[in-house]
From Swiss-Prot:
PANTHER family from the UniProt entry: GLYCEROL KINASE, SUGAR KINASE
Function text: Key enzyme in the regulation of glycerol uptake and metabolism. Catalyzes the phosphorylation of glycerol to yield sn-glycerol 3-phosphate.
Organism domain of life: Bacteria
InterPro entries, per the entry: ATPase_NBD, Carb_kinase_FGGY, Carb_kinase_FGGY_CS, FGGY_C, FGGY_N, Glycerol_kin
Taxonomic source organism: Francisella tularensis subsp. mediasiatica (strain FSC147)
Notes on how activity is controlled: Inhibited by fructose 1,6-bisphosphate (FBP).
NCBIfam families: glycerol_kin, PRK00047.1
Gene Ontology CC: cytosol
Enzyme Commission number: 2.7.1.30
UniProt pathway annotation: Polyol metabolism; glycerol degradation via glycerol kinase pathway; sn-glycerol 3-phosphate from glycerol: step 1/1
Protein name (Swiss-Prot/TrEMBL): Glycerol kinase
Family that this chain belongs to: Belongs to the FGGY kinase family.
Reactions mediated catalytically: glycerol + ATP = sn-glycerol 3-phosphate + ADP + H(+)
GO molecular function, one term: glycerol kinase activity
Amino acid sequence: MSKDFILAVDQGTTSSRAIIFDKKGNIRKIAQKEFTQIYPKSGWVEHDAMEIWGTQSGVMREALEFGRVKPDQIAAIGITNQRETVIVWDKETGDPVYNAIVWQCRRTSSICDEIKRDPQFVKYIKENTGLVVDAYFSGTKVKWILDNVEGAREKANAGKLLMGTIDTWLIWNLTRGKVHATDYSNASRTMLFNINSLEWDKKILDYLNIPESMLPEVKNSSEVFGVTDSHTLGGAEIPIAGVAGDQHAALFGHCCFEKGMAKNTYGTGCFALMNVGDKPVYSDEGLLTTIAWAENGKPTYALEGSVFIAGAVIQWIRDGLGLVRSAEDSEYYATKIDSTNGVYLVPAFVGLGTPYWDMYARGTIVGITRDTKREHIIRAALEAIAYQAKDVLECMKEDTGLDLAGLRVDGGAVQNNFLMQFQSDILQSEISKPKINEITGLGAVFLAGLAVGFWKDKQELKSILTTEKVFEPQKDSQAVAHDYRGWKKAVERSKAWAECYS
């Protein structure tokens, strides 16, 4: 039977998804199932690792059944996943010793504070992992499990426990324990992997007291990791041939293969990644250095910046203020006026991310006069999303010395044409919106397809990724500079507010 399809396994923070793609990049079927979010204490977030596997294997079978695709028609599987979330399990039984600790979980903040008391070690971590010391990353989460779960430390020291990010857990289960591996992109998010030597970092492992025997083998993002066990998917042994963290897979799905190419994902927040080539670039502007993907043992590096509040500001003006009935209405109101008339909205509801990193900043609306109307506030909210993206992308330009070679966009907010046009104006750069919405899944299947010869090269991938719309700058650079100065002044007003007035 001909192998006409590739299956994307897209394991996210709130749901497990499976997407079947054909050779032209068309979607045959999507299946999705949400799973339980566990909050044992304030600031703690967990997932049931067995529920993750159960929902993920379930949607894979569902996509095949309802897409009318037989398992032996699948040429390969590509995995993309929520990053940093980590699981520790028993090597013999395959049972987790504790729930998965999710990337959002802040329980290891005190461990991070302890590390930060040693500035030289903090510097070492940044220079060798590309990351800042934060509870966000996997390393301190593993330490917490070993220190707090009864018997875990002893078992780990005896070589009886394994750890892995979500991709590793899925590979382990898909192969029935035959393969314990991760890819370079996911490894680079653990705070345990040296992105220069491309090995697990012994100095950091020793500091956190994590036995190296627990760690998975690190493989290329585009490579056959192993095959599914014959009992997993209807008797078929399907190659698992592509693996990447979700934001990395999106960069690959956007075909950002050249240095200077960047993508921005507009979700609740924003994640911007720029391809910086075959050598790591370290940021002076608060960005993270990461491995985008690796092929044939050669990594491609990226800079990453995150904005905490993007699409969430539209939810706020809808649900909190009642200024619009639906998110789609925001575009209608924003286009009823020519400008915000000097009004700026800084959505620092939970502080500010890149490049400000101010946890005490708070939301601010400035420039209000007696003439300010609902439309001005709505438009200012949309413009704030674009200004924050510009903040991040300007940092990338500063760190790399590269001009932005256009911006590829995805996520829910890209359906707002006003926002995309304003983003193009404020960046003075072309914005490309692809026809396909499932860019993360597409990136995973692109990686898998290249590994098994389903597609021959990246040039063929570029022909599959078709553009729905291109936005070109329509404002002159002087007007843009004037507006951006106003944004910067507004941000200054929002800084340290909770610290000063709590």
